[in-house]
A protein has these predicted regions:
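Metal-dependent polysaccharide deacetylase catalytic core of the NodB/CE4 family, i.e.
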Residues: 123-127, 151-247, 304, 309-311
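A glycine-centered loop/beta-turn motif at secondary-structure junctions
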Residues: 6-114
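His/Asp/Glu-enriched short active-site or ligand-binding loop at hydrolase and phosphoryl-transfer sites
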Residues: 249-285
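Alpha-helical scaffold elements lining the catalytic groove of polysaccharide deacetylases
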Residues: 93, 191, 205-226, 271-297
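C-terminal beta-strand-rich structural cap/linker in extracellular carbohydrate-active enzymes
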Residues: 406-441
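Catalytic grooves of carbohydrate-active enzymes
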Residues: 84-85, 104-109, 113-126, 152-157, ...
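Surface beta-strand/loop "capping" patches
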Residues: 345-391
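Active-site beta->alpha N-cap acidic-glycine motif
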Residues: 84-191
Length: 441
């Protein structure tokens, strides 16, 4: 991660100060800190330089750069080193899985296979912040969302292949005399259906009223304008904003958390409701954000981009204009998530189903000759695995299918309770307990 173009300086948020380790012979380095030629010239002494005599200049320079992630071996053991705090947050799950993939001749593990795009606080059903909306857009909030924001979002989703889940609130302000007008609810629900998208509920409000009170006040609105629509997902800025879990509507099956909860992993809020924290805001994508997304995709095949439109209605500065926000989300989705197109685009309720299956799945694995066998327990419909190979190719899958998503990495779809993966140019391995990763829950 290096600033190479004007304007990228604001993306650089990785720790620039780390201990400077130069690695020895037999080391495989995965990540290094970058230094200018001048800094290397002024800092590296002749004794260290002598160790790299005879190497090509560029190779010697790369060997001198401060190592961040590297691996060495002692007899048959492989020792991995992490120079920094990269194992202190959610990034650890991806780093550890990558280490496992580098340790063995092959590695296979389950993933969720879900890529969400959550649009929080869309659309507007009341003319809130009217003066500011007129000043910026010469239209009411309702018109801004229907005539400007909505067409832009559908265009972005169409170009990127993303599926939207729009988290709706009748209003942000409950202490004024303005009442929401739901005449456009049917319009949006129809448009969402056409886009293969869905609607959920938003817990946001300006006054921060308890969720139970907000749900109570919103209930009449939804019963009047969307009596037959089942809202199965809810958006909240964080777990604390949910308050008492009993306040959740009975039909809610999953809760999406805002970008402030990006350090958490998917799981259960309670025995009935899953939790899907944001993995990115979609607007701001720093180098560290990108690294965390890569780690999450490596470990789980999962991302949950959360674009909160509250700031469109209540902007704090020029950066909150929809023109600038839409350009950023379109550029980021089209650039930084392109590498993960092999994973499925999903809505929140679709990813909720996959998360439940992922967490319930038990599996074992064994290899004999060219065949890797996966016996599965508690499989409910489809399950997905990532298989990492070194110098081998998958040629056939019985009980499912496969797709090579990058060199040596395969996405395996399991459709039966036992899956056999045939690889090319393999030898025969027999693994005893503790000798190979693969048993898992």
């Amino acid at each position: 991660y290096e600033v190479t173009e004007p304007g990228e300086e604001e993306r650089q948020d990785m720790n620039p100060s780390v201990p400077w380790y130069t690695t020895g012979a037999g080391t495989k380095t995965y990540m290094v800190g970058t230094l200018s030629d001048e800094t290397i010239e002024q800092t590296v002494d002749d004794e260290i330089r002598a160790q790299y005599m005879g190497m090509e200049e560029e190779a010697a320079k790369n060997s001198l750069l401060p190592a961040i992630l590297w691996r060495n071996s002692v007899d048959t053991a492989k020792i991995f080193c992490v120079n920094g705090d990269y194992l202190a947050d959610i990034s650890a799950v991806g780093i550890l899985d990558a280490m496992m993939g580098e340790t063995y001749d092959y590695d296979i593990y389950p993933v969720i296979n879900a890529q969400n795009l959550v649009i929080a606080d869309l659309p507007a059903f009341v003319s809130e912040n009217e003066e500011e909306m007129q000043k910026r857009y010469s239209q009411s909030a309702q018109a801004v969302y229907q005539e400007i924001v909505w067409p832009s979002l559908t265009s972005i989703a169409s170009r990127t292949g993303a599926k939207m889940t729009c988290m709706m609130t009748p209003q942000f302000t409950y202490t004024d005399e303005e009442e929401p007008d739901g005449e456009n609810v049917t319009y949006y629900l129809k448009r969402l259906k056409e886009e293969h998208a869905e609607a959920g509920l938003s817990a946001d409000s300006r006054e921060g009223i308890p969720l139970s009170e907000k749900i109570k006040q919103d209930q009449t609105f939804w019963q009047t304008y969307a009596p037959s629509y089942r809202f199965l997902s809810l958006y909240a800025d964080g777990v604390k904003s949910i308050g008492e879990e009993s306040a959740l509507p009975a039909e809610i099956r999953t809760v999406a958390l805002g970008s402030g909860a990006s350090g958490q992993a998917v799981g259960y809020l309670n025995e009935n409701v899953t939790l899907q924290p944001s993995t990115s805001s979609g607007i701001r994508h720093t180098f560290l954000d990108d690294f965390k997304v890569k780690c999450m995709e490596t470990a789980l095949g999962y991302s949950n981009i959360t674009l909160d439109l509250y700031s469109v209605t209540y902007p704090e500065g020029d950066e909150d204009s929809w023109e600038k926000m839409s350009k950023k989300i379109a550029a980021n989705l089209g650039t930084y998530w392109k590498a993960y197109e092999a994973f499925d685009a999903t809505t929140l309720t679709e990813s909720d189903v996959r998360i439940r299956r992922f967490l319930a799945l038990d599996y074992k694995q064994q290899r004999a000759g060219n065949v890797i066998t996966l016996p599965l327990e508690h499989r409910e419909d489809a399950a997905w695995f990532l298989l990492r190979l070194h110098g081998e190719k998958v040629t056939e899958v019985a009980g499912g299918s496969f797709e090579e998503i990058e060199d040596g990495v395969y996405l395996i779809l399991a459709e039966e309770d036992e899956v056999s993966v045939k690889v090319q140019n393999g030898e025969t391995w027999q693994y005893q307990d503790g000798g190979k990763r693969g048993d898992g829950t």
